[in-house]
Amino acid sequence: MSDNTGTPEPQVETTSVFRADLLKEMSGAGSAPAATGADNLPAGSALLVVKRGPNAGARFLLDQPTTTAGRHPESDIFLDDVTVSRRHAEFRINEGEFEVVDVGSLNGTYVNREPRNSQVLQTGDEIQIGKFRLVFLAGPAA
C-alpha cells in the first residue's frame, strides 16, 4: 500500500509454465499410445487422460466393469467442479468395448463435442464432463 509519498506501488507479474511435452502428448503428435503409456496397460483396460480442466494431465485407469465419474467424493473418478454433477457418468466395459453413459447429469456428457447419452469409445475420443475434457486411450485387446 502506498503511503502517499508519490512512490507507485510495484506491479506484480505472474508467469505460467508451458509444458511442451504435455501439448505434444495431447495433440497426438508422434505415437499417442507410446507417449501416454497406453501400450503398457493390462489387456482389456483403458486410460483416460485429463486434457483440459483443473487437474490437466491426471490419468485414470479403466479396468473395472463400471467406473463412476462425478463430483461425489466416492466417485472412482472425482472431478471437483460445480459444472460436474455428483453422479455424472459411468464408463462401462461391455464385451470388450468401452462405453461412456451419462447417468442423468445436469450439463450432459459430450463425446467429440457432441452430446451423448451413451457412446462406444474409440482411442483418441474426447469426452467432456463439465469443464473437464478427457482423452480415451484403449490398451491392448483382451
UniProtKB/Swiss-Prot annotation:
SMART domains named among the record's database cross-references: FHA (SM00240)
Keywords tagged on the record: Cytoplasm, Phosphoprotein
Gene Ontology CC entries for this record: cytoplasm
TM stretches of this protein: none
Keyword Phosphoprotein: yes
Residues with the Phosphothreonine modification: 14
Domain (FHA): residue spans on this chain: 67-116
Protein name: Oxoglutarate dehydrogenase inhibitor
Lineage top rank: taxon: Bacteria
Localization per record: Cytoplasm
Physiological role: An essential component of the PknG signaling pathway. When unphosphorylated, it inhibits the activity of 2-oxoglutarate dehydrogenase. When phosphorylated it does not inhibit 2-oxoglutarate dehydrogenase.
Protein's UniProt keywords contain Phosphoprotein: yes
InterPro entries linked: Cell_Proc_Reg/RNA_Proc, FHA_dom, OxygluDhInhib_OdhI, SMAD_FHA_dom_sf
Organism field: Corynebacterium efficiens (strain DSM 44549 / YS-314 / AJ 12310 / JCM 11189 / NBRC 100395)
